[in-house]
């Protein structure tokens, strides 16, 4: 990560004709927010931070103690290239703290940073990569999103079946301009479904990249008159969209996922921890009622199991070599807060290492096939958001690793989501208004 001083940032503003500066952060569900200041006010904002009303952000603060402060993470500074070149727009990702400088429990970037610090304390380095899927839909003549996909292509199709290739190219070129390093892009299985993968990076950088990636996709799609949706299951008869999280561990420069993984090795214990806590993590990796329509079909897992190569498993070990050796967690979806999702996966793996958990045997069966899981004694991922919340609320592990104010507010908001959907006169219309148009 580059080191920047406040003066470096001010020089950058001057050299690049920046007139507008966004201070970006996210709520506890991963919805990006921002406050903008004029470049002329940037020196004061860098020195003092930017104050805002935390009671207006989902899951943050109560009205009677609402003041919070944004502190920009200077190395995350970037130009938004889709904005005007005259009077350019610049953006930081920010940490959130209390006015007296005390840590704020809802600062999800801080939570992930702390989990990464704990790994480094053990001499371990963690790299993370994300594979993000999304849908592209047509807008109606008033510019409102429809559920009509822009094409009827399938996996790896090309034009004319793939109508999104030019948009993906524009997205990848924009990512490259902004330092996100796209690795692969292609049409996915669903009609109008696409996938773009980023090269791996450190945990915090990857979570920032996921947030920026979604911002880029939406901006480029909107510029083209198209609606980009990260809803996990926007079409009931098409594949769901995942956010597969790939992790590798290094000790003294050696990738611990390379070669055979002994059940009681560091890598084996890490995987065992992730599997052991996967049901508790699901409310964070899959935060919407819609998320649970994805499980159990179209390469999305249902059971707590692992294997090599097998895409019907929750965790798989791809057959690759060298630095590409890793574990892949296949349950998360793109509606999640990437800081919490990645941070909690690290926490689960760390718990496995610290308690020397032993990796169970692999399950070398196609668990998408009816009856294949019978007699194996496998646990299942939660079937609904209500079940996921109930499991998480009873988790000693989550109460130990998460700030109390964050977990309490998160669970309360999730229960409210369940109740609102249950009370809706037209659940499908409620989902369209509150999730399809926004996620």
Please give the residue ranges for each predicted region.
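Glycine-rich, acidic/polar active-site loops that bind/position phosphate-bearing ligands
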Residues: 1-439
């Amino acid at each position: 990560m580059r080191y920047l001083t406040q003066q470096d940032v001010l020089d950058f503003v001057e050299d690049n004709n920046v007139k507008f500066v966004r201070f970006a952060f996210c709520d506890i569900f991963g919805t990006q927010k921002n406050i903008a200041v004029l470049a002329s006010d940037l020196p004061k904002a860098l020195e003092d931070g930017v104050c805002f009303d935390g009671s207006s952000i989902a899951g943050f603060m109560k009205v009677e103690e609402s003041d919070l402060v944004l502190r920009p993470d200077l190395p995350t500074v970037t130009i938004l290239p889709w904005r005007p070149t005259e009077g350019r727009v610049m953006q930081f990702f920010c940490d959130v703290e209390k006015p007296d400088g005390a840590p704020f429990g809802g600062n999800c970037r801080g939570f992930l940073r702390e989990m990464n610090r704990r790994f480094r304390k053990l001499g371990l380095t963690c790299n993370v990569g994300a594979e993000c899927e999304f849908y592209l839909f047509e807008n109606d003549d008033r510019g409102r999103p429809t559920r009509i996909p822009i094409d009827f292509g399938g996996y790896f199709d090309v034009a004319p079946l793939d109508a999104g290739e030019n948009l993906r190219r524009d997205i990848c070129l924009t990512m490259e301009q902004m330092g996100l390093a796209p690795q692969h892009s292609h049409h996915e299985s669903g009609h109008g479904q696409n996938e773009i993968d980023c090269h791996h990076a450190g945990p915090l950088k990857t979570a920032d990249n996921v947030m920026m990636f979604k911002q880029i996709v939406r901006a480029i799609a909107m510029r083209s008159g198209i609606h980009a949706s990260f809803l996990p299951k926007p079409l009931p008869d098409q594949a769901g969209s995942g956010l597969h999280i790939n992790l590798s561990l290094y000790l003294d420069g050696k990738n611990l996922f390379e070669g055979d993984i002994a059940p009681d090795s560091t890598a084996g214990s890490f995987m065992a921890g992730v599997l052991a806590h996967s049901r508790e993590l699901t409310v964070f990796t899959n935060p919407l009622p819609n998320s649970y329509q994805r499980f159990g079909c179209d390469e999305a897992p249902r059971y707590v199991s692992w294997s090599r190569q097998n895409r019907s498993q929750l965790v798989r070990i791809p057959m690759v070599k060298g630095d590409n050796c890793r574990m892949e967690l296949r349950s998360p979806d793109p509606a999640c807060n990437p800081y919490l999702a990645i941070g909690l996966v690290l926490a689960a793996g760390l718990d496995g290492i610290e308690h020397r958990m032993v990796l169970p045997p692999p399950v070398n069966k196609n668990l998408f096939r009816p009856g294949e899981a019978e007699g194996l004694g496998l646990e299942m991922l939660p079937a609904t958001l209500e079940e996921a919340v109930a499991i998480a609320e009873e988790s000693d592990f989550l109460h130990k690793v998460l700030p109390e104010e964050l977990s309490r507010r998160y669970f309360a908001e999730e229960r409210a989501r369940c109740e609102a959907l249950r009370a809706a006169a037209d659940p499908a219309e409620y989902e369209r208004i509150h999730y399809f148009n926004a996620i």
